[in-house]
Design a protein with these regions (language model features):
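Hydrophobic recognition helices of helix-based DNA-binding modules
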Residues: 106, 155-162, 188, 216, ...
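Terminal helix-turn-helix DNA-binding modules in bacterial transcription factors
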Residues: 186, 190, 195-202, 207, ...
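N-terminal positioning helix adjacent to the helix-turn-helix/winged-helix DNA-binding module
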Residues: 122-125, 173-184, 220, 229-232
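Short hydrophobic/aromatic patch on the recognition helix
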Residues: 60, 211-216, 261-262, 266
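…primarily DNA-binding HTH/wHTH and HhH modules…
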Residues: 253, 260-272
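Generic protein-terminus/edge-of-domain signal
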Residues: 1-62, 68-69, 75, 99-100, ...
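All-alpha amphipathic helical-bundle segments outside canonical DNA-binding/catalytic cores
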Residues: 121, 137-153
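A hydrophobic/aromatic-rich effector-binding and dimerization subdomain
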Residues: 1-19, 70-135, 160-165
Length: 272
């Protein structure tokens, strides 16, 4: 799970105005967090990887991603995606009736995303409320109070219209499979800078190598080893941009013990 804190403990809401063109490979890589997320496509076309699904969002569409769900965003060119993440208890205290009756049933359900398009009246209302939330972020005088009021309005519309048993645009997830993928990813994130084998990665969560391969193919469309290499290269890229360390040092700190091999992979990945 992401370690990064979104918002603060006394105001667990955070707004981002992201342009995918500014990210490496026009991509916000696979991640998950306890906050649920609402994302709007202001311009461009964005591919959302959510669990095992690939959803293409066009300009003017939006999406809800539930708490702790694995997701990724990609655009072939520019993709402007204003978005906000929010702790469930921002809308109402965790021990309150409001939370237990209207929030918990959704965040603890097997719904993992809901797409919003303008051909449904209630979905149009959700999108309009999202835009209001984004616009109010520039108003320092009433930002926090207005954001809370609008979030409660948004959630009311969402709760009134989403049906937990729907099999249409509301999508469900294989929770056990996703949890295994997340555990493997977390293990890689914590141990990428040392020698790791597929056997060790799989045995860490008590599954076979073939099961680990199948899970990563289903969810991430890659292998655990290729994901490990990609994560190491991502870590190396950050060190190259933000430190004055020598290439050899960066290679070793990123888990590569052959500098020539590291340089070949890095140049290939970043088209140098």
């Amino acid at each position: 799970m992401e370690i990064k804190q979104h918002g603060s403990s006394d105001y667990p809401f955070q707004y981002y105005y992201d342009n995918l063109e500014l990210f490496d490979f026009h991509c916000i890589e696979w991640h998950w967090h306890r906050e649920f997320e609402f994302l709007y496509v202001e311009s461009g076309q964005v591919t959302c990887g959510i669990g095992e699904k690939q959803i293409i969002l066009s300009e003017g569409e939006a999406i809800f991603i539930n708490s702790k769900i694995l997701h990724r965003f990609y655009a072939s060119s520019s993709g402007i995606i204003p978005n906000f993440v929010c702790m469930p208890e921002f809308i109402a205290p965790e021990n309150s009736l409001i939370y237990k009756k209207y929030i918990l049933p959704i965040i603890s359900s097997n719904i993992y995303f809901q797409r919003f398009q303008t051909d449904e009246l209630w979905q149009t209302k959700i999108i309009q409320t999202m835009i209001k939330i984004m616009e109010i972020q520039g108003n320092e005088k009433i930002r926090e109070l207005a954001t809370l009021a609008l979030m409660q309005d948004l959630w009311l519309t969402f709760y009134e219209n989403v049906k937990l048993s729907d099999k249409g645009d509301v999508q469900t997830v294989d929770e056990v499979a996703q949890k295994r993928v997340q555990l493997i990813m977390q293990y890689i994130h914590e141990n990428y800078n040392r020698n790791l084998s597929l056997d060790e990665i799989a045995s860490h969560i008590g599954i076979s190598k073939s099961t680990a391969l199948n899970l990563f193919h289903r969810f991430l469309h890659t292998t655990p080893v290729n994901y490990l290499i990609g994560y190491r290269l991502q870590a190396a890229s950050w060190l190259l941009k933000n430190t004055n360390k020598k290439v050899k040092t960066i290679a070793y700190e990123s888990g590569f013990h052959n500098v020539d091999y590291f340089c070949r992979l890095f140049k290939k990945r970043y088209h140098l």
